Design a protein with these regions (language model features):
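Bacterial N-terminal signal peptides that target proteins for export
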Residues: 1-8
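C-terminal segment of classical bacterial N-terminal signal peptides
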Residues: 14-22
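Boundary/entry segment of secreted carbohydrate-active catalytic domains
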Residues: 24-73, 101
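Aromatic-lined substrate-binding rim segments of carbohydrate-active enzymes
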Residues: 52-55, 63-103, 110-115, 145-173, ...
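Active-site groove signature of glycoside hydrolases
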Residues: 120-150, 174-180, 204-218, 285-293
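Substrate-binding cleft of secreted/luminal carbohydrate-active enzymes
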Residues: 213-216, 244-324
C-alpha cells in the first residue's frame, strides 16, 4: 500500500519540476524585420552599409534586414554584397528576401524557382546566409494576374516550396498574402489547404504567414477590420504558425495623387497602424516595416526628421514589447 506521505512527496516533486521547467522556458520575443524603400536603384539599402553610424540606435532594435531577390540582382555588385554580408554578420543581423513563387514571368512553381535559384546562389557565394524567404502573394497573383483557380495556386505554390526545401533545407519559407481583398476565412482555408498539400508531398509546411494589409480600405470602403485581422492572428497562433504583419503607409498612394503626401505621411501612417492594432491587443510575432512606395525619400539618419530609420526606431520603441 502507498502511504499518504509518499504520495504527497511525489506530487510535490512533480509540481516543483513542472514549475521549474516552465520558469526556465524562454519567452519567444517578437522580432523586427525591415526593408527600406527601393527607389534610385536601391540607394536606401546601400546607405545602411555606407553610413552605419547613422542608424546604430535603430539597428540595435532590428532582427532581420530584407529586400527582393530581384533587387539584389539588379542593383548591387558582388564586391558590395560581399562587404555588406560581412557587416551584417558583425551586427548580428539576419538576411531575408521577398521572392516570387507564382508570377506572370514564372507561372509555375518550377519556373519561378529555376529563374531565382541562380540569384540566391550568387548571394551565397558573396557570403549571404539566407535566413528566410517570403513568397510574394502567390494566391493574389494567381487570381488577379494569371487568372487561374485557387487549386492551381495551391499546387504550384506547393511545388515551389518543395523545390526550396530540397535545395535550401535550412531556409525558413513563409507566405505573404493580402487583406482585406481576401477574407479571414479565405486566408484560413488557403493556409490549411496549402499545408495539407505540402504534407501530402512529404514537405514541411509554412514557417510563417505574413499579412499585407491595405488598411485604408477599412474606412474608405467599409471592407475588413482590425478586429477580424486579430482573429486571424489568434487562429495562426492556435495552429502554431508564426504570424507576421507588415506596417506601411496604406494611404500614401491616394494622398500622393491628391498632392497631400510627403515624408511625414509615411511616419504618421505607420505609427497610426501601430496604435490601431495595439489598441485591440494585436501582437504579431514579427513586426515587418516595409516600404515599396518610394517613401520616405531619406533613409538616414535615425535622428533625422521623417527618415525611414527614424520611423523604425520610434515604432519599435513604442510598440514592440519583448515581454508579450
Amino acid at each position: 500500500m502507498i502511504r499518504f506521505p509518499t504520495i504527497l512527496i511525489a506530487a510535490t516533486a512533480w509540481l516543483a519540476s513542472f514549475v521549474a521547467a516552465h520558469a526556465q522556458a524562454p519567452k519567444v520575443r517578437p522580432t523586427v524585420w525591415i526593408s527600406p524603400p527601393g527607389q534610385e536603384k536601391g540607394r536606401a539599402f546601400r546607405d545602411l552599409f555606407e553610413r552605419p553610424d547613422d542608424w546604430k540606435e535603430t539597428r540595435a532594435m532590428v532582427d532581420v534586414l530584407f529586400a527582393t531577390d530581384l533587387g539584389f540582382q539588379r542593383n548591387y555588385s558582388d564586391e558590395e554584397l560581399t562587404r555588406w554580408f560581412g557587416q551584417m554578420r558583425d551586427w548580428n543581423l539576419k538576411f531575408a528576401m521577398e521572392v516570387g513563387a507564382i508570377k506572370e514571368w514564372g507561372k509555375t512553381g518550377a519556373e519561378c524557382f529555376a529563374k531565382e535559384q541562380p540569384y540566391w546562389q550568387r548571394l551565397q557565394k558573396a557570403g549571404a546566409k539566407i535566413y528566410a524567404i517570403a513568397m510574394d502573394e502567390p494566391l493574389v497573383c494567381t487570381r488577379e494576374h494569371i487568372h487561374e483557380s485557387d487549386e492551381y495556386a495551391v499546387e504550384e505554390t506547393a511545388n515551389y516550396v518543395a523545390q526550396v526545401r530540397q535545395h535550401f533545407p535550412e531556409m525558413l519559407v513563409g507566405d505573404i498574402e493580402a487583406y482585406p481583398s481576401s477574407s479571414v476565412e479565405e486566408h484560413e482555408h488557403w493556409i490549411e489547404t496549402l499545408n495539407k498539400r505540402l504534407a501530402d508531398k512529404g514537405v514541411r509546411g509554412l514557417d510563417f504567414y505574413r499579412l499585407d494589409v491595405d488598411w485604408l480600405r477599412f474606412n474608405a470602403q467599409g471592407k475588413g477590420s482590425w478586429k477580424d485581422l486579430r482573429e486571424l492572428e489568434r487562429w495562426c497562433r492556435q495552429k502554431k504558425l508564426p504570424f507576421q504583419l507588415i506596417y506601411w503607409a496604406s494611404g500614401y498612394p491616394a494622398a500622393s495623387k491628391r498632392g497631400l503626401a510627403d515624408d511625414s505621411t509615411w511616419y504618421t501612417a505607420i505609427m497610426q497602424q501601430g496604435y490601431d492594432y495595439a489598441l485591440i491587443d494585436g501582437k504579431p510575432d514579427a513586426y515587418v516595416i516595409e516600404s515599396w512606395i518610394g517613401a520616405p525619400s531619406q533613409c538616414l539618419p535615425d535622428n533625422g526628421e521623417w527618415t525611414f530609420t527614424r520611423s523604425v526606431r520610434d515604432f519599435a520603441r513604442k510598440f514592440v514589447k519583448h515581454d508579450q
